[in-house]
Each structure stands twice: as C-alpha cells, then as structure tokens.
Design a protein with these regions (language model features):
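Active-site C-terminal subdomain of aminotransferase-like
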Residues: 1-100, 104-137, 153
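PLP-dependent enzyme catalytic core of the Aspartate aminotransferase-like
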Residues: 52, 117, 133-179
C-alpha cells in the first residue's frame, strides 16, 4: 500500500461481522496497531496507489509477454496470461493482474541465480509492490527455509516485483540478464 518500500503493514478484511469483531478484539488486546509515522507513510502511499497499480500491471503484462517468447524461459507464472491456472479467477476478482511475475529459466538453479546477478535495472531484493523493480531467487532467499518440504519452490524460479519504471528499460534489462 505504501509503495515506497519503507513501511510494513497489512489488513484483514472479512465478510463476517462476528469474525471481524473477534479479530478487532484480539488486535486491541495484543496492541498490534501501527504507529503514527507508519500510518502516515501508508496514507501517503494511498494517494498514488491507483496510478501505481495501473503502471505495475501494465508493465508486468508486457514483461510476462516478453518472457513467454524468450528461448531461455521454460515457464511464466502471471495471472494475466490466459494459460495461467488462476487466470479465470483473477479476471473475475481483479481490475488488472498486478505486478508480480515469476518465471523458470533453462539451466537450473545456477542459471536462475545468474539472471538475478546480471540484472541492472531490477535490483536484487526481497520486497514487493514498491515503485522500483526487484528481482530475486526465492529458493536462496525468501523460501530458503522451505527447502526439502512441500513448500519448496523450483530451483530454477526467478521472481520479479515489476515496478513503475519505463517498461522498455525493464524489457531490455531482462533481455540482457537472460543473455
């Protein structure tokens, strides 16, 4: 929501009033509320949320499309693609398809890590939804603790949080990173 990678927060939205009241009670009892500065950061971000989300989605759609045609990419995961298993649900629930794109690269784990290391416009990082584009290798970063479990991600997976930069810069960066 903040959009500037400088605050962590969240929301629980439920359709059941009794559950909402129970959650509010527990939140109040635990003191799990945002501080004034964090609240201000989120409020600041909400002022540009709509235009940021439009640009995230627009850029991510173009990135996903380019990746589907790249010879070194074996699979692209983006709900905006008709072949994505969740596409129909996403199309019903969402105005656009967001800025998160994952893809699998030919050559396994080392090739995926190399793509991350070669990126210049995409910054290596473990956040999402900010104005800047980020790239990560989840198997070694956010999901490293899941190795060997049912939650393990494919070793050749690269995850992108597509930002609001000029899309041509993003596409060129991924082209050169993929080699």
């Amino acid at each position: 929501m903040g959009g500037h990678s400088d605050v962590v927060g969240g929301a629980l939205i439920v359709g059941d009033q009794a559950l909402g009241e129970e959650l509010a009670y527990h939140q109040n009892a635990m003191g799990a509320v945002a501080g004034p500065f964090d609240s201000w950061l989120v409020l600041r971000g909400t002022k540009t949320l709509s235009v940021r989300m439009d640009r995230h989605s627009e850029n991510a759609t173009k990135v996903a499309d380019m990746l589907t045609r790249h010879a070194r990419v074996t699979r692209v995961l983006y709900p905006g693609l008709p072949e994505h298993p969740g596409h129909e649900i996403a199309a019903k629930q969402m105005k656009a398809f967001g800025g998160m794109v994952s893809f699998q690269v030919e050559g396994g784990e080392e090739a995926a890590v190399e793509v991350c290391n070669r990126a210049k416009v995409f910054t290596l990082g473990e956040s999402l939804g900010g104005v800047e584009s980020l790239i990560e290798h989840p198997g070694r970063m956010t999901h490293a603790s899941a190795a060997g479990s049912a939650l393990e991600v494919p070793a050749d997976l690269v995850r992108l949080s597509v930002g609001i930069e000029n899309v041509d810069d993003l596409l060129q960066d991924l082209q050169q990173a993929l080699g």
